Curated annotation (Swiss-Prot):
Protein name per its UniProtKB record: Serine--tRNA ligase
A Pfam family: tRNA-synt_2b
GO MF entries: ATP binding; serine-tRNA ligase activity
Gene3D superfamilies associated with the record: Bira Bifunctional Protein, Domain 2, Serine-tRNA synthetase, tRNA binding domain
Record GO cellular component, one term: cytoplasm
Family from the record: Belongs to the class-II aminoacyl-tRNA synthetase family. Type-1 seryl-tRNA synthetase subfamily.
Gene designation: serS
Residues noted as binding L-serine in the record, renumbered to the chain: T272, A273, E274, E326, S426
Organism: Xanthobacter autotrophicus (strain ATCC BAA-1158 / Py2)
Taxonomic path: Bacteria, Pseudomonadati, Pseudomonadota, Alphaproteobacteria, Hyphomicrobiales
InterPro entries: aa-tRNA-synt_IIb, aa-tRNA-synth_II, aa-tRNA-synth_II/BPL/LPL, Ser-tRNA-ligase_type_1, Ser-tRNA-synth_1_N, SerRS_1_N_sf, SerRS_core, tRNA-bd_arm
Pathway annotation from the record: Aminoacyl-tRNA biosynthesis; selenocysteinyl-tRNA(Sec) biosynthesis; L-seryl-tRNA(Sec) from L-serine and tRNA(Sec): step 1/1
Disulfide links within the chain: none
Subunit structure: Homodimer. The tRNA molecule binds across the dimer.
Length: 468
């Protein structure tokens, strides 16, 4: 979330950032100028109301003291007049307090919907076609046969079952079994071992269900509510129904009551371990000596994929449930750029050990995530698809998430607390890594060779063959 003081003092800064995210068009500039004017207007109303409130509170306190003085001087007329004034002030103050809260809420809601400002070095652009390649590792392998896509390989092995998964859960789920399930587990364990043993990350086993505040802190809410899974108990659902009864469906009052009830009763399934890992420092003040704090977790992740209709409908590329190893760093503003490059190198390292061909691209202003200041995507080569596909996204968020979480640190030189900088990245997506291994290491006879780096995790199995 942005600092309203920064917007008030440097409105052009936010306008420029929003125009860059909008592709630099005149329409984007006009919309940005209107939004910033609206924000400044809300802030002026809020501050004016607070000034009025503080004035009335101060006058109430002063008048209350004057009442005592008037009574001590036997000036009953003055005391009576002051008591009437205090009574009027007491009647006005709750109204002003409520109004101040309303302005504060309106401003916070408006600020919460604004994306982070791109760093100056982020390339301009509208979408993924404008992303800039940064580096490349390895070369695409040659095959004496036409390589198959991962789902063709997995189904032919009899170890990847989408049909049964659909019976259990619907579309965009998979059942992996046998050696293929072990290979998937091996990938997650391998990634964790490298990041904890070689890269200095601390492993965390976090909750998979989180509250509204956690999702807000990392900026999944309110912007991406439609892409999340929300869960509740039967009693909770009935309570929500009772809370919203009598309100016109989809009215503002209904939505407000629904949001309030959901916040109290339910939980969100995490779309990424970034949510619980980053929120470990919410509402806290760390010492500078504790930073950088580097955390990793291997968790299931859950996404509704609301905007993915018609895309990647076959296979494991885009699923409602998938496993991912996440990397999170909490650091100081001075070190965040360096930490971003380090995180990228850590994510690349596991792919290099698997000898997978990949490239790194810097996302343009129009393709980067809502909370990001700058993002690198790692795209792995899939021989069966004949295309590079994202397997990791590493982002630096500055203090954008820290402000939403109120996560701070105390500088070593003894100055007042400052907001931390947060970074997150996939280290990497386990399901997509499995896809890459199946397509890269497939053999003409349909078997799959286990990469050397994974052999210690496979119990002596060197080749995955069709189940008999």
């Amino acid at each position: 979330m942005h600092d309203i003081k920064w917007i008030r003092d440097e409105p052009v800064g936010l306008i420029t950032a929003l125009v860059r995210r909008g592709g630099g068009s005149d329409e984007a500039k006009s919309a940005a100028e209107k939004l910033v004017a609206y924000l400044i207007g809300l802030d002026e109303q809020r501050r004016r109301t607070l000034t009025d409130l503080e004035g009335k509170l101060a006058r109430r306190n002063a008048a209350s003291k004057e009442i005592g003085q008037a009574k001590a001087q036997k000036d009953e007329e003055r005391a009576s007049r002051l008591m009437a004034e205090v009574a009027n002030l007491k009647a006005d103050i709750p109204t002003l307090e409520a109004l101040a809260k309303d302005w504060e809420k309106s401003l916070d809601n408006a600020l919460a919907a604004i994306p982070n400002a791109p760093l100056a070095e982020v390339p301009p652009g509208a979408d993924e076609h404008d992303n800039v390649e940064k580096s490349r590792f390895g070369v695409a392998r040659s095959y004496a046969f036409t390589p198959k896509q991962h789902f063709e390989v997995g189904e032919a092995l009899g170890q990847m079952d989408f049909e049964t998964a659909a019976k259990l859960s619907g579309a965009r789920f998979v059942v992996n079994k046998g050696p293929l399930a072990r290979l998937e587990r091996a990938l997650g364990q391998f990634f964790l071992d490298v990041h904890t043993g070689e890269h200095g990350y601390m492993e965390v086993n976090p909750p998979l269900l989180v509250r509204d505040d956690a999702m807000f802190g990392t900026a999944q809410l309110p912007k991406f509510r439609e892409d999340q899974f929300f869960v509740n108990t039967v009693d909770g659902i009935e309570a929500i129904s009772a809370e919203t009864k009598g309100f016109e469906t989809f009215s503002d009052e209904f939505k407000s009551k629904l949001t309030e009830a959901m916040s109290y009763q339910g939980r969100w399934l995490i779309p990424t371990a970034e949510v619980p890992l980053t929120n470990l420092v919410r509402e806290s003040i760390l010492s500078e000596e504790e930073l950088p704090l580097r955390l990793t977790a291997c968790t299931p992740c859950f996404r509704a994929e609301a905007g993915a209709a018609g895309r990647d409908t076959r296979g494991m590329i885009r699923q409602h449930q998938f496993t991912k190893v996440e990397l999170v760093s909490i650091t100081t503003p001075e070190k965040s750029a360096e930490e971003h490059e380090r995180m990228l190198a850590c994510a690349e390292a596991v792919l290099k050990k698997l000898d997978l061909h990949y490239r790194v691209v810097t996302l343009c202003t129009g393709d980067m995530g809502f909370a990001s200041q700058k993002t690198y995507d790692i795209e792995v080569w899939l021989p069966g698809q004949g295309a590079f596909r994202e397997i990791s996204s590493c982002s630096v968020c500055g203090d954008f998430q820290a402000r939403r979480m109120n996560a701070r640190y105390r500088p070593a030189e003894g100055k007042g607390p400052r907001f931390v900088h947060t970074l997150n990245g996939s280290g990497v997506a386990v399901g997509r890594a499995l896809v890459a291994v199946l397509e890269t290491y497939q053999q003409e006879n349909g078997a799959v060779t286990v990469p050397d780096a994974l052999l210690p995790y496979m119990g002596g199995l060197k080749t995955i063959e069709k189940l008999k």
